[in-house]
């Protein structure tokens, strides 16, 4: 690829989680993707997708989003000097992520209905206008996000026994499969952890009813379902025991490990920063104190 649109993404820390691991019966590591430039793992894929769009002379980029993709797409489009249109399901996007997209100058279009409806509209816009769709249906997104798996192997010095990550649309699960294949060290047991209340979960990043990559993701990973109380409990524990302030959806991996209790070396992927979703943070802390 001749053109590189980058904000310095990747190379995120892999941190031991000994206090979280107490009682779980495993050696626990935390892949801290909140350290990426816009605060989530989406940056890994967006650098590749937007670089490709710029190289191909695309007039702009478009995507549907519940938040993290919007923030990342807007930032990388601004870096590339390309316009961006973000299609959002009305009322479903966390305030922190919305602020990032607005600050970067993206055009926001709110639509009624679910993420799935926003996704259909974004695909139609891309087809009608000739813009590049940078949702995870774009293979460049998956290719970029695959880099995290190789980093884990390099940072650990070996293949972990288990990798657990949040399961929303399924694109990141597919990316990890691809990344471990590229690393050539084999594939660990993958836990794709979803919210039981997919429609209404407070973890907005995985509030997706119809995963776009369901078939591929569920063929490669073991799907684990956790409840709202489990998500909230482990989200608070990650901050209080290990000092990492992640967004609620990021706690899904740890919650899934707590439910399944795998042995060996376990890596949980914390996909985004807690500042992404201040309303969820405030409401849950307030309800706990109350």
Region roles according to the model:
Residues 1-290:
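PLP-dependent amino-acid enzyme catalytic core
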């Amino acid at each position: 690829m001749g053109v590189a649109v980058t904000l310095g993404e990747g190379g995120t820390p892999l941190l031991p989680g000994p206090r979280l691991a107490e009682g779980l019966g495993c050696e626990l590591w935390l892949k801290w993707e909140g350290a990426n430039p816009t605060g989530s793992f989406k940056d890994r894929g967006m650098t590749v997708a937007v670089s490709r769009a710029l190289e191909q002379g695309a007039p702009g980029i478009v995507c549907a989003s519940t938040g993290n993709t919007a923030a990342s797409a807007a930032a990388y489009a601004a870096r590339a000097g390309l316009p961006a249109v973000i299609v959002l399901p009305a009322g479903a996007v966390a305030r922190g992520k919305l602020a990032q997209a607005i600050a970067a100058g993206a055009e926001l279009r709110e639509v009624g209905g679910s993420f799935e409806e926003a996704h259909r509209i974004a695909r139609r816009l891309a087809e009608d206008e000739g813009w590049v769709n940078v949702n995870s249906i774009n293979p460049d997104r998956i290719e970029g996000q695959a880099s995290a798996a190789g980093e884990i192997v390099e940072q650990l010095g070996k293949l972990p026994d288990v990798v657990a990550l949040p399961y929303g649309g399924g694109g990141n699960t597919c990316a990890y499969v691809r990344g471990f294949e590229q690393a050539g060290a084999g594939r660990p047991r993958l836990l794709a952890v979803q919210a039981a209340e997919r429609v209404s979960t407070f973890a907005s990043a995985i509030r997706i009813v119809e995963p776009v990559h369901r078939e591929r993701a569920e063929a490669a990973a073991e799907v684990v379902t956790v409840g709202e109380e489990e998500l909230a409990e482990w989200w608070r524990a990650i901050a209080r025991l290990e000092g990492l302030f992640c967004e609620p959806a990021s706690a899904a991996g740890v919650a899934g490990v707590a439910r399944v209790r795998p042995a060996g070396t376990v890596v949980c992927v914390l996909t985004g920063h807690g500042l992404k979703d201040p309303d969820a943070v405030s409401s849950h802390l307030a309800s706990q104190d109350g």
